[in-house]
Amino acid sequence: DAEEIKADIKKFLTETLKLELSEEKTLITNARDTARFLSYDIFVSDNESLHEDKNGHTRRVRSGKVKLYVPSEKWQKKLMDYKALEIKYQNGREIFNPVHRTYLISNDDLEIVQQYNAEVRGLYNYYKIADNVSVLGHFNYVMKFSMFKTFGAKYKLHISGVRKKYGYKHFGVKYQTKQGEKILYYYEAGFKKVKTGIAKPEVDNVPKVYRNNNPTSLIS
């Protein structure tokens, strides 16, 4: 059983590799229970399906499938670490309130969008193999409105004014290059599960820009 396998591994590490097995970190968990590993929640889900046997009888077959989940506290903690979220309590319920990030207000408009894009893409790239990776849509919602409020605090605008200035459907910041004017858009690629392999990460290439007379903006 699992205890015997653990004992054999411990013996091999001690006698052959001269290493010590940490009892605190080497825990045996029932496959039906959730285990936390590398910031993923891992468990085996019971899937039942009907199959016909060789005699033509229909039988219910149960097969366990390993599931990887994004723990909700992980993406919530990221928001708190970025100071993009305040959690309020009303009638015993948690209310998520996106807030502006004071330490980004002095950055160029282009740098602000790049910062948010890098943080959203970074979390998605880490969890893209999770079965419930789509929950990062909640993370993205808070980040997007935090960005709106950051621009609002910078230019003394309401969210409606910010969206009117930079785009309602596609939020984008204009900047100048040798090839002319370009636009950097806020992340819009979604949060689909990646089945296998490691995809090449999408990043915002840092553009070469021409500054205007406004020292706090790269916008022409």
Language model features: what each stretch is:
Residues D1-S220:
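Non-catalytic terminal/accessory segments
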